[in-house]
């Protein structure tokens, strides 16, 4: 392929248009510049934002709990999708009113932050945020100082997070893992068993990957591979926009400890890989400047499927980790100490990964079957080094490397009879996987909204430590809001939620409402449990967004224009320029 066929990145500059500053005579006005804006102030802005927030929370709220309902999503092509996953529902929501849509985006941000941090709990976080915003706006409308109320929210949340950590129990054995996974997957015991089986095979520090099966059966396979604690350098490399992932099959892998910043460093190897029509993963000390721009441009233009990540670790440990990666993928480590240069690299020096998945902070490599013997030899070498070292630090790091190499990757191959069932099942397994790792990390608490409800009972005592009356309002808002998830779970199960809440108040922390069997019981003993990390992140993110809403005084959005279609016609079918 000629060098000219690879597009070179270039710097672009953008000018900022001058705007005349409008007089703020009215409380609602339109600024006309390159694009007209609508600005809405005070109560109207908060009312319309809240309307958008309520629509999202109502849509995802119906799925909460073991007896939560389904939601039908219209697809651009094919049959509608029937799902019970809050993440997918919130992603699909776009509202016609631009201010309401801004509110919808705010509560979607709560869910997104919670999902990014803990991998689950998006529906609970959305419900919590809606309640805090509802009660908070009531207080502000009645004349409370929003800054003081926000301080009360923040202080109460900080206190409750500390109490939550005190009540969290460590995960003990297979049963706890199975229960966490089952609950997160919508009380699907088969998925719970599957996640427990997978972790039995690779350990709690292992890696789980989810793929589509070629049959209708769902199976767990353990394959050679490893996870790297580094993500993509640029989000422009993303191939799966919904999940913000880079996903490639049969990917070539370049492994080096050198910095790549000049075009000349990478053009030769890019041309060779382009001829193979194969994707490329670059693992280097850094990729920046013209080199990064060139990769991004060629990825966006469809010339080459490529992704770049920074090498994990530091100093000598970085070299060792890169050697591990090279062995897993069958690559030759292009080391600067040996006088090797990236610009002289050839295809034969690249490794191969059967599957590569890159997130914003992790990369999973599933190795080609041919690498198995080399990986076993590397593990044996590391075990020998481990036996000979006296350093506590070296012992820890060598053990970590051995675990990464020997654990492998548990691949859950998901099968189903229909496309709709397949997508729903994959979403449930993804939730179960994320919840399980969150539980292993920070422990478990009673589920069913019970942990949040019992935390609300601790607020009155904490409120007595506050001296500002409006900060106490913030504490009251948190207290009332924390009871909403339990109430909604009961409502979705067909019973009176407020009655259940009153029955649980004053009970021990472990006692809650098991909606699956309509019974108040010890939820830890019953296996109805949630990861403490999910509960913590849901609470903190809800308080954060509620504080933003309470201190919002104006909203500026794009003013909608009639969309035009070819032939000078508007979307309504009338000729453009006509008054309708």
From Swiss-Prot:
- List, alphabetically, the Pfam families matched: Cpn60_TCP1
Miscellaneous information on this protein: This protein shows ATPase activity.
Question: Which GO terms label this protein's molecular function in UniProt?
Answer: ATP binding; ATP-dependent protein folding chaperone
Recount the UniProt induction comment for this entry.
By heat shock.
One Gene Ontology term from the biological process aspect of the record = protein refolding
A cellular-component GO term for this protein: chloroplast
Q: ATP-binding as a keyword?
A: yes
Subcellular location(s): the record lists:
Plastid, Chloroplast
Origin superkingdom:
Eukaryota
Q: Where is this region: Disordered?
A: 1-24
Q: Which family does it belong to?
A: Belongs to the chaperonin (HSP60) family.
Output this protein's name: RuBisCO large subunit-binding protein subunit alpha, chloroplastic
Q: Which PANTHER family match?
A: 60 KDA HEAT SHOCK PROTEIN, MITOCHONDRIAL
Quick one: where is this thing mainly located? plastid
Composition bias of kind Polar residues appears in 1-17
* Quaternary structure, from the entry: Oligomer of probably six alpha and six beta subunits.
């Amino acid at each position: 392929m000629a060098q000219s066929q690879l597009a070179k990145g270039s710097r672009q500059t953008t000018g900022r248009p001058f705007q005349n500053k409008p007089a703020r005579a009215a409380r609602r006005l339109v600024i006309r510049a390159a694009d007209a804006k609508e600005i809405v102030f005070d109560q109207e802005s908060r009312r319309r934002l809240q309307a958008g927030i309520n629509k999202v929370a109502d849509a995802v709220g119906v799925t909460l709990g073991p007896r939560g309902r389904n939601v039908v999503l219209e697809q651009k092509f094919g049959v509608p999708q029937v799902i019970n996953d809050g993440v997918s529902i919130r992603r699909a929501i776009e509202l016609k009113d631009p201010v309401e849509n801004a509110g919808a985006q705010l509560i979607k941000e709560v869910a997104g932050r919670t999902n990014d941090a803990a991998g689950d709990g998006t529906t609970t976080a959305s419900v919590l945020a809606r309640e805090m915003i509802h009660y908070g706006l009531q207080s502000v409308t009645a004349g409370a100082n929003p800054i003081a109320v926000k301080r009360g929210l923040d202080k109460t949340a900080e206190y409750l997070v500390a109490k939550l950590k005190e009540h969290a129990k460590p995960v003990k054995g297979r049963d706890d893992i199975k229960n966490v996974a089952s609950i997160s997957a919508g009380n699907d015991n088969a998925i719970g068993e599957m996640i427990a089986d997978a972790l039995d095979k690779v350990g709690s520090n292992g890696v789980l990957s989810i793929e589509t099966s070629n049959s209708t059966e769902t199976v767990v396979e353990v394959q050679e591979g490893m996870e790297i604690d580094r993500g993509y350098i640029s989000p422009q490399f993303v191939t799966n926009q919904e999940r913000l992932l880079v996903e490639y099959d049969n990917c070539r892998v370049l492994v080096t400890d050198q910095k790549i910043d000049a075009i000349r460093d990478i053009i030769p190897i890019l041309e060779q890989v382009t001829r193979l029509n194969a994707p490329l993963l670059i693992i280097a000390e850094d990729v920046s400047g013209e080199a990064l721009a060139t990769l991004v441009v060629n990825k966006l233009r469809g010339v080459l499927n490529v992704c770049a990540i920074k090498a994990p670790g530091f100093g000598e440990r970085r070299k060792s980790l890169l050697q591990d990666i090279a062995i897993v993928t069958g690559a030759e480590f292009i080391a600067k100490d040996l006088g090797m240069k990236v610009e002289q690299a050839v295809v034969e020096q690249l490794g191969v990964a059967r599957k590569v998945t890159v997130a914003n902070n992790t990369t999973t490599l599933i190795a080609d079957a041919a690498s198995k013997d080399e990986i076993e030899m590397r593990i044996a070498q590391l075990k020998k080094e481990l036996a000979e070292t006296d350093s506590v630090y070296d012992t820890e790091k060598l053990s970590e490397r051995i675990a990464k190499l020997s654990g492998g990757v548990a691949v859950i191959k998901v099968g189903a009879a229909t496309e709709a069932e397949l997508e729903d099942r994959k979403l449930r397994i993804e939730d179960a996987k994320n919840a399980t790792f969150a539980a292993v990390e920070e422990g478990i608490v009673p589920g069913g909204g019970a942990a949040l409800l019992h935390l609300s009972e601790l607020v009155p005592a904490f409120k007595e430590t506050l001296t500002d009356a409006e900060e106490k309002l913030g504490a009251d808002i948190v207290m009332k809001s924390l009871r909403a998830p339990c109430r909604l779970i009961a409502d979705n199960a067909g019973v009176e939620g407020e009655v259940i809440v009153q029955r649980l108040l004053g009970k021990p922390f472990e006692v809650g409402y098991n909606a699956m069997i309509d019974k108040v019981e010890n939820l830890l003993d019953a296996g109805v449990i949630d990861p403490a990390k999910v509960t913590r992140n849901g609470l903190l993110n809800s308080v954060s967004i509620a504080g933003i809403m309470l201190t919002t005084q104006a909203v500026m959005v794009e003013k909608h224009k009639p969309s035009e279609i070819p032939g000078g016609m508007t979307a309504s079918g009338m000729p453009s320029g006509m008054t309708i």
